[in-house]
Amino acid sequence: MAELRAETQHGGIWPNYGNPVQMNTGRYNTQESSVPVGSAASSHLVRPRSRQHTMDYHNAPYHHGRPAQEDGDGYERYPHPSLMNIPSITTGMKRSYSQVDQTPYTEMVQDLRDDYKPAMNHDQKLLSFKKVGDKHTIVDHKGRIHEIEIEAQLHGMFFLSEFPSPGDGNVLNAELTCYRRNLFQISGNICFPQIPLSVMLETGETSQIKNMEVTISAIESVDGHPVRLIVIPWKTPPPNSPEVNQAPDQEPPSLPLIPWSEEEEDNGGDHYAIYPIGWRRLQFRIATANNGRRKELQQHFVLHLKLHGTLANGTKLVLSELTTAPIVVRGRSPRNFQARKEIPLLGSSAGSRGQTLVETGHSIVAQAVALNKPPYDSRPRVSSMDLPRTAFTFTSAKQMPQSPMQMRSNSYPTSWNPSSQVSMPHNPGSTSYPTTSMAGPEPYPKMPLSGAPSYTAEPQEMPIQQTSMPSMQLSMVAQDQQPSAPIRTQYATYASAPPPHLSLPSTADSSLNVPRYVDSNPRPSKSPRHGSHGSLTNETASGEYRYGPPSYLGNSSSDISPQSQHHPPTSGAGAGGASSGAYGTPSQEGGASAPASAPTSAAPPRDYFPPSQSWTSTAGEGQTSSYTNGGDRSYSFPTGVKTEPHSQPSHSGAPVPGVYGNNHYAWNAT
C-alpha cells in the first residue's frame, strides 16, 4: 500500500494533469483502489486509480465532437504486472500513452499561434502588392510551364485610419490611408527563367514573347475609372542621376525589361533573371471622395502593377497583374482629422522615419541580374523588399572646411598630425585628440562668471613656446624655437596667459595657436571629474583668475590685481586718509597711499586676465613701469565714504613717496 500512498500525494499536487476528460460511462467504479496491486487481474486498473482525487465538476460530460480515447482498449498500454512491485518504476510510469497524447488541445494552440504572429508581417502585407492571377499560361519551347514571380511594395507616409463608429455599434475596420500631398514610392523585382518564353494562346498555339514592360496605374473603386498618377520632378536632382526633362504633371513611365539574347541555349532552367523595378516621387492627382462621412459612399484608390508582353505576332497581352489594398487618399489638412485615430505602419515612412530610401530619378530601367540556381531549389526566392541601391554613389567632400565655426564640432579631420598631442597625466581616464592650429581671432570674447572658479576645457587662443611643466606636457611647437626662461609680465604690454591648468608662460612672437574648442577630456566641462576642473588639477588657490574691471572702473588700466577687483577702496582708520574725488587704490600694509600722477599709457581693453608665473609676492621688490591709473580722474562711490584729500603717511614703515603701492605689487611711477 506504500505505492498507493505515493500516488495519492502525487495526485494531490497534480490532480488532473495530463488525464483525459472523465466520461459518465460508469466503466471504472470508485472501489478500484481497494483491489490488491499484486494481482494479475488488476493490471489494467493501475492507470485510473487517481480518479478518486478529482473534483466533482470533472464528472460532467464533455461535449466535444471527437470520441473519447478510453473507448478502445487497443490504444491502452499498461505496465507489466511483474514490474508493479518496484516503487521506482511505479512512480516513473504514472501516465500511459493515451494520457500523453492530448490532441483536442492542439487546434486551440495552433489558433493562438496564428493570432499572435508579429505585427510586422501584417504591416508588410498591407503595403505589399498581391497577385491577381496569371492571365495566360507561359511555357518554354519544350512545353514546360513557368511562372513569373513579381514582388512589389509601397513606401511612403501610409498609415491605418479608423472611421467613426456608426450608430448601430458596428466596429469598422481600419483602412490604409495617406495624404495626397505626400509622395510615395514603389519598389520591387521580377524573377523568371533566362530562356525564351512563349504564351499559350486560346487556340492551343504558342507565340514567343519578344518584349516585356511593367506599368503602374490607379483605379477608383466606385465606377472603376482610372485615376491619374503624377511624378513630382526634382528641384535639385541627386548626383549620378540621369538627366530627364520632366513636365510638371508627367505620368509615371513604363519600365521596359531588357530582353535576353536570342542565342542563349536552354540550360534546363538553371539560370534565372531578376529585374529590379521602381518608381520614385509618385503622387495621386486627386483625393478620394467622402472621406470618413459615410461608409457606403467612401471612395478608394487601388494601384495596379501590370506586366505586359509583346508577342511575335504583334499582340500585346497582360502576362501578370498585382494590386494593392484599397487606399483612402485625404486631400485636406491633417488638422481636420485630429479626432481620428491613426496607426502608423512599420514598413512605411510613417512608422520608421529613419528609413533611407535611395532615389535616383523618376524611374529605374530594369536590367537583369543572372543567378545560378542552387541544387536544392528550382527558383531563387527574392526575400528582400528594399529599394535597389546599385545606381547610387555617395561622394564625400574633397576638402574640409577651414572656417572656425565649422571647426567647433566633435568631428576632427584625420589629416591632423596624430604625433603632437596634449597629454594630461593627472587624468588617467581622458583621451587625447590631435591638435591643430586655427588662425584668426576669437569671434566670441568671453568673461568668466563671478561664481565660476576657472575656465575648463576651453583654452584661449594664444602663442606659446616650447617648455615642460610638472602639470602637463605640450609637444606641438615649431622646431626652430629655443626654450627660454619664464619672463616677468610687464604691465605696459598686452599679452594673454594660459589658464592655471596649462601653467605655461606666454610670449608674443610664437607662431602656434592652441585651438579653443579642442578638448582632451570627453567629460562635460562642468563635471567635477573633468580633467581640467579646479578640484582635480588646479593646484593654485581659487580665485586666481582676474576678472574685468567693475562697472565703476574704466578700461584705461592694463592690469589690476585680483584683490583690487573684488573690494572697492575704503578708508582705513589707521591710515588717516581715504580717496575722495580721485580714485586711489587700497593702501599697503603700512597704510600708505600716494596720488597717481604719471603719464597715461592705456592698453587696449580685454575681457579676462589670467595670472602669470612672473608675478611676485614681495611688496619691497619694485619694477619700473609706465603704468598709471589715470590721475585726477573722478569716480562715483556710494554715499558714506569719507572724502578727504590725499595725505602722506606719518608712520615709519611708509615707502618712498615716489613709489605707488597696490597691495603686494609695487612699482615706480616716475
Curated annotation (Swiss-Prot):
Residue ranges the UniProt entry marks as DNA-binding: 106-341
Q: Where in the cell is it found?
A: Nucleus; Cytoplasm
Write down the Pfam families for this protein, in alphabetical order: NDT80_PhoG
Residue ranges with Polar residues bias: 394-438, 553-568, 611-631
Task: Provide the residue span(s) of the region labelled Disordered.
Answer: 394-457, 496-670
Database matches in PROSITE patterns: NDT80
GO biological process per UniProt: meiotic cell cycle; positive regulation of transcription by RNA polymerase II
What are the record's GO terms for cellular component? cytoplasm; nuclear chromosome
Q: Which domain of life is it from?
A: Eukaryota
The Low complexity compositionally biased stretches are 592-605
Any GO molecular function: DNA binding
| Transmembrane helix in keyword set | no
**InterPro entries the UniProt entry points to:** Fungal_trans_regulator (IPR052605), NDT80_DNA-bd_dom (IPR024061), NDT80_DNA-bd_dom_sf (IPR037141), p53-like_TF_DNA-bd_sf (IPR008967)
PANTHER family hit by this protein: MEIOSIS-SPECIFIC TRANSCRIPTION FACTOR NDT80, TRANSCRIPTION FACTOR VIB-1
Q: What does this protein do?
A: Transcription factor that acts as a positive regulator of nonrepressible acid phosphatase activity. Is a major regulator of responses to nitrogen and carbon starvation and is essential for the expression of genes involved in vegetative incompatibility (like pin-c, het-6, and tol). Vegetative incompatibility is a non-self-recognition system ubiquitous in filamentous fungi which results in programmed cell death.
State the name under which the record lists this protein: Transcription factor vib-1
Q: Which gene encodes it?
A: vib-1
